Amino acid sequence: MKAISATELLRVLQFGDSTLPVGAFSFSNSLESALQAGEVHDANTLGQYVRAACRQTSGLDGVALLAAHRAACRQDLDGVLAADEALMLRRVGEEQQLMTTRMGKKLGELALRLCPAPLTGEWVKAINDNVTPGCFPVGMGLLFAGLELPERDAFAVHHYGLASMMVGAALRMMRVDHYDTQSILFAINGEVEDEYLRVAGFGLGDMAGFAPVFDVMVAHHVESHVRMFMN
């Protein structure tokens, strides 16, 4: 296996950083509803909820990300757009649709500023022309393909980003501390390789994310009264 260079490592770290300006801090991925409903109430239940969200995401966002990365490596815009559409059709929650499209467009615009690539430019134009939704995982796949970074790294960064977003939101809404949230992240990070191997052979037709409690919380989120920035 080719050793990753220091520059490649730093690229991976940069795009996995919570300070990446794509708006992730504005979302909780339904954690607000889970707190209101009592599904999450301490560090243990928080860890279980984040793990369930990450596992569901592997079979949906993760599959779309891998498909987009592979299509981008072939310079196949139609394949990228197909991954985008397939994911949007399966992300039925209002918050999740808003989250993935808002963050996706911002990531695409950032990618064009940092490391412009023709295919990324075509994807962003398709978003602006309302031809494609512009889902965040698809943008991540495009970005990493353009940087010639492997799909496994893109998958891991996306997986980490979701978990980091949720525990960051938890710190603002419930009684947990940084030791709790870092322990959760450490445990979930240890599972990402298995999650990648589980879905690496999936095609777009295999995308699935059966997690009924999580889906109910996503649907309930629109009416939730718990908010991250409540004062």
UniProtKB/Swiss-Prot annotation:
Cell location: Cytoplasm
GO cellular component: cytoplasm
Family annotation (Gene3D superfamilies): Urease accessory protein UreF
Record's keyword annotation contains Kinase: no
Database matches in InterPro entries: UreF, UreF_sf
GO MF, one example: nickel cation binding
Keywords, in A-Z order: Chaperone, Cytoplasm, Nickel insertion
Keyword Cytoplasm: yes
Self-association state and partner proteins as the record states: UreD, UreF and UreG form a complex that acts as a GTP-hydrolysis-dependent molecular chaperone, activating the urease apoprotein by helping to assemble the nickel containing metallocenter of UreC. The UreE protein probably delivers the nickel.
Classification via PANTHER family: UREASE ACCESSORY PROTEIN F (PTHR33620:SF1)
Role: Required for maturation of urease via the functional incorporation of the urease nickel metallocenter.
Record-stated family: Belongs to the UreF family.
Protein name (record): Urease accessory protein UreF
Designated gene of the protein: ureF
